């Protein structure tokens, strides 16, 4: 009987193991993942992908396992990741897949925790990451055309893809790993139409060894067919609040038997310096996921956990230029520090009801311990101008890349001729934030976000030293503006009533972001300077834990702790703290170095247990309407007046004849469903040949109504190249709302293109009137 009991116990144990593992990947076991009629198939059985997007680059390697466990406890069965080219190949031909960059180790950890992997190797990844994941050194080739069949770009892409294949191809499920799908490029329809290029990237992915699992391409519902290849799976990206049926309508018409997947379901949104902290409603997010699960639609939650964009790796959007904060909290279910939020528990409750057969959702892992650090003074300082590196000489102005510098700050120095008072110094262009000095005296600051590029000079004697210190704040990560060279990109001129004079004969000093560089300075006692300087001190800890460094009294710059680049700070907010993982601290002495380009109010740092992500000190108003301001259209003759079609996708309105002017006004008469708020995703004006006009210099000069209650739904979103961000009027404001666009110069237009917003929460415009004139 005892022998029988042992056998029964063994059988029960085996059954429990099988039950717990369900359809999870176990190391060494080979599986088949394929496409069936209307569904994905895992070993021949229908499988709904419930993926959590997290990024190994935004999580300390020591915390990878915890974050993966958090995703599993959320109810997910898959982890979705990008591969970041520029983190792995920071110098041409030098690949780094070790330590924090060990992407294969990350995937194996996911497999150990019973999670599949969706791999997105780019080469372009967007992700609010520096240059969309492309390496800066590509821009050293002056005529390069990124994300095209440019021979050099394709050559370097194939080399990188082969290295990714060496790391990950053997981790496909057919070979005992956990990779079930691999993506080709990323949202390319928002960039261009070029199927030949997409085919080349597909071939590069295959040549790298990814031949066993389905390859897919993601795009927006309005653009997915522009570059869709017949042999790739098509997936759609959209976010919280989307109308699920409308998003998939065109895909179902094009491929009625294909499995459906939202490859990026945006749980929140990212933060920009100088703009309000972004949040999205948890209930609306969960409702959207439920709608998909009820229809057996697979999804990947972007982001399940955003983490932190450590160091200098944050990207930017354009137009208008706007750099990303270091926090990538994203208002995701798992917070920046790895905590389970109310949004997490709400989603977990739903996913528990849709668990896979045999799936047991584990308990939520405990968060890492928190500590506080009492305020301490950063008591050593090294003025930047007293710690200049060796210069490079250049006859003419060149961007940072031509001096073999990828990131950081760059100083351009020359001597001036005699300058009359009132002369204008024109810097074309400032990328991204500059300070101008004459013999060490600050004359002005220029911010690319505001389009600033001139300083009016006082009278200056011949031989006066001119210094232009330029900080690179992050390369644009979206659309054609990714060709974003840093420093001063063209030239510097003096403009006066006697003419224009281009300045030449520059001494150029590079200030990179490497820890070895910032450590090797002549530090001396002192705790406050007016102007750019490095600050250093040490602080003692009796215990270690996660903490948020409070940078509220500092100006603008970067922080390093124990050699780790923590990220950027800027007094304008909304982010005022930097997440400091406890795994990078140590008991006893810890070192902190701070580069502050403005100078601190107080050279003091303390560690808090809670982040500050929503303290905005920006000078710019949140909306585009001054107190009491109104728009008078009486007597104006419209250039267009009519109704827009309902439904998803771009619509085009042609005028009876071309018109010339600078200011364009769009007035929304009503909404498709008769409710009181209007919305628009994207808007283009068409030139006399019917082609879209460039929008990088556009500005909203007036907006009658803008919603900022639970997001930045301001009017400038109609030309930010993002279908997922949009202008929405404030709930309850009366019709008709109006938006006035300033093109900055007179243009001839023949019509406009308009992308309606397809959300379940907001309404598209129905009737519109358009006005066009040369003066405000």
Kindly label every feature range from the protein language model.
Residues 208, 241-335, 339, 350:
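Catalytic-core region of carbohydrate-active enzymes that cleave or remodel glycosidic bonds
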Residues 64-130, 202, 206-207:
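Aromatic-lined substrate-binding rim segments of carbohydrate-active enzymes
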Residues 153-229:
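Active-site neighborhood of glycoside hydrolase catalytic domains
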Residues 422-437, 539-562, 569-570, 592-595:
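Aromatic-lined ligand-binding clefts that engage carbohydrates, nucleic acids, or primary amines
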Residues 468-474, 594-600, 667-674:
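Short beta-strand-plus-loop segments that form exposed binding edges in beta-rich domains
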Residues 566, 627-637, 643-776:
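Aromatic, loop-rich ligand-recognition surfaces of beta-strand-rich domains
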Residues 92-99, 112, 123-148, 198-202, ...:
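Aromatic- and acidic-residue-enriched segments that line the glycan-binding/catalytic groove
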